[in-house]
Amino acid sequence: MRCRRSFAVAVTAATLLWGTPATAGATSNNLVALWEMNESPGAQTMLDSSGHGLRGWIGDEVGAGVWVGGATGYRFSRLEPDTPPTHPRHLAIVPDATALDPGSRDYAVTIRLRTTERFGNIIQKGQATAAGGNFKLQIPSGIVQCLFRGSAGSLLVAAPRAINDGGWHTVRCVRTRAGLTLIVDGSTVARRSGLTGWIDNAWPLSIGGKTNCDQVSVGCDYFAGDLDYVAIQAA
């Protein structure tokens, strides 16, 4: 990320924050975590600039301190899908914390990414069979999808077009009590009504792929590309 102001611009560009125009415009009070990904090459700690101390661990296969297209971020190299061995050091991981679980709150995840690949889980907390539910953003066939699964059910929204063109894109997924909304580069591209309910698991938050996988019966879905920042908000 170039600076804190970059994140503020990305957030307020969206006409929808928690699902209604009346609440558009994020403030620092909404922030749960902000990982600006400005660390130097070789860094092992992912800093949280929200003030909440939700630091993460940067695997040594993650390229920190990469400058590309006017932004400093992390680079995740391409790994062949569903091909052993696993690469746990391909991930950036934040330990489980109550603040990171959506619970029943309105909850938004914002990421800025660039990729030319057609697969991978960008960010997730929990997996498909996790007790307590899970959420994730993934990019199969270059198309961003967002999923939230909770006590009341599961919802998935997907962008209508691929964004794996090598350019920077800002993706925002908003879970409210009414459903899911997906915003790409400031425009709402998908919306689905429905309930997801309570989401609270004991898993870490993982950036770059799954933490519990073997690349045989469970693929690790490693992301390949660059990330500029990740932010989480809740209200």
PLM regions and their residue ranges:
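Extracellular/lumenal carbohydrate-interaction signature centered on repeated Trp-anchored short motifs
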Residues: T27-N30, D96-V109, T129, P160-G167, ...
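Short, aromatic/His-centered strand-loop micro-motif at the edge of beta-sheets
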Residues: P95, C146-T170, S217
